[in-house]
Amino acid sequence: MNIKKVNLLDLNREGLRAFFVELGEKPFRAEQVMKWIYHYGCEDFDLMSNVNKKLRQKLKECAEIVAPEIKVEQRSNDGTIKWAMTVGDQEVETVYIPEKDRATLCISSQVGCVLACNFCSTAQQGFNRNLSVSEIIGQVWRAAKIVGVTGESGKRPITNVVMMGMGEPLLNLNNLIPAMELMLDDFGYALSKRRVTVSTSGVVPALDILGDRIDVSLAISLHAANDTLRSQMMPINDKYNIADFLAGVKRYIAKSKANRGKVYIEYLLLDHFNDSTDQAHELAILLKDTPCKINLIPFNPFPGNDYQKPSNSRVDRFNKVLMEYGYTVTVRKTRGDDIDAACGQLVGDVIDRTKRTMKKRLQGENIAISAG
């Protein structure tokens, strides 16, 4: 009889300590093994030299360390790396963005997305399922293995993690929170809570739960300054409108030390849709009572979508209006523009190729059956 092995990447420190107690071991074994897994990227129990041989054998029999595998990799001339990683028989997208003073990893929380935002490449794929804890933290583990695990000292290969990949993170809280705990844990990736960021489209009840259970940086996908426009772009706005959303944000930042009293507002600029100077004034007035920093994101076009990227002059005019109101504003740099730019596009391309392959295979089988 085969015993299903426990994937240790599914367990935060508390869960791992309980696991070792069940094995009849001391709880401190959890910290020993975590250092091997997360500080050194180790997946072979035999290499864990400070773990006794008897326990290593026991672990080989009942546990495993399994992370998503790389299916497709794209490397940009600017150093950006985009991966399609396999999770079961599906794929999610993970992006590594190195800069002079930091290295940010953008990870996914779901296979596809249920929210159907009309500017999003991932939304075109529909929703399949939530990722497990191991599939979320495993993206960090796999990326760290590729870009260089440094152990106890040396420059960190990943300094920031953002939940801005495929999926709505707050619709997968039960798995997201333990994964983020591993990012923050000293025996995990030991990241500062200001360097772990969750982005949400506005699942207000889950935002309240998040604030009660963990403290990380918050970014919100706003993208419009009135409900009429936002509902056109984001169906979730019909359930939780802008006023409800911003009220939830204020409750979160009142609890949070990671945000230092401010939230990051993400505003996607769509050419001649939400990028006029009048709309910039409207946004500035809307946010006057919300302590925030604003991140303007020029749209990255992708096949099958009619929105266009605004000109630099339109972006500059929008930015100037906000700055005149005293806001701190950044314009997101275009990174990796020589590889698939839009979030979800790489996995979308993989899915399209897979569908074409399956179609050809089925056509071949039909021909064979007909010939028989």
Swiss-Prot record:
Active site: 93, 343
Pfam families from the UniProt entry: Radical_SAM (PF04055), RlmN_N (PF21016)
Top-level division of the source organism's lineage: Bacteria
Keyword Oxidoreductase listed: no
Gene Ontology molecular function: 4 iron, 4 sulfur cluster binding; metal ion binding; rRNA (adenine(2503)-C2-)-methyltransferase activity; rRNA binding; tRNA (adenine(37)-C2)-methyltransferase activity; tRNA binding
EC numbers on record: 2.1.1.192
Signal peptide location: none
Keyword Nucleotide-binding included in the entry's annotation: no
Location of the protein in the cell: Cytoplasm
GO cellular component, one term: cytoplasm
Residues binding S-adenosyl-L-methionine, per UniProt: 167-168, 199, 221-223, 300
Additional note from the record: Reaction proceeds by a ping-pong mechanism involving intermediate methylation of a conserved cysteine residue.
Protein name: Dual-specificity RNA methyltransferase RlmN
